[in-house]
Curated annotation (Swiss-Prot):
Subunit-level organization: Forms homodimers. Forms a heterodimer with TSC22D4/THG1. Interacts with histone H1-2. Interacts with GNL3.
UniProt subcellular location: Cytoplasm; Nucleus
Domain of life according to the entry: Eukaryota
Lineage summary: Eukaryota, Metazoa, Chordata, Craniata, Vertebrata
Record function comment: Transcriptional repressor. Plays a role in the repression of hematopoietic precursor cell growth. Promotes IL2 deprivation-induced apoptosis in T-lymphocytes, via repression of TSC22D3/GILZ transcription and activation of the caspase cascade. Positively regulates cell death in response to TGFB3 during mammary gland involution.
GO cellular component, one term: plasma membrane
One Pfam family recorded for the sequence: TSC22
Stated name of the protein: TSC22 domain family protein 1
Amino acid sequence: MKSQWCRPVAMDLGVYQLRHFSISFLSSLLGTENASVRLDNSSSGASVVAIDNKIEQAMDLVKSHLMYAVREEVEVLKEQIKELIEKNSQLEQENNLLKTLASPEQLAQFQAQLQTGSPPATTQPQGTTQPPAQPASQGSGPTA
C-alpha cells in the first residue's frame, strides 16, 4: 500500500518539475520575465535552472557541430564543382578536337545515329583511334 502511495507523489513531483522546467525554458527562449513566469528559490527551482543551463549548453554544442559540418560539406562541394568544371572543359576540348579530325562522312553518320537514337559505339572508336592524330603530328614533324 505504501508503494502505491509513493508512486503518485513521485509522479506529481516529476510533473511539477517538468512544468516549471518548461516554463523556464520557454521564458528563456522568449526572453521575457513575466510575473507569472517565476521560479521559486527552492531546490527544485535551482535544479530547473541547472537543467535549463545544461540544455542551452547542449543546444550551443549541437549548433556549433552543425555549423562545422555544413562548412566542411560546402568545401567538399566547392572542390567537386571545381573538378567538374575542369573535366567539362577538358571534354569540350576533346570534343572540338574530334570534330576537327573527323571526316564529313563520320560526322554525318554520327548525326544520323543521334537522330535515330541508336548508340554511337560503332563510330566512337573510329573517331578516337590514333591514326587521325598521327597525320597531325606528322604534319607538325617536318615543320619543326
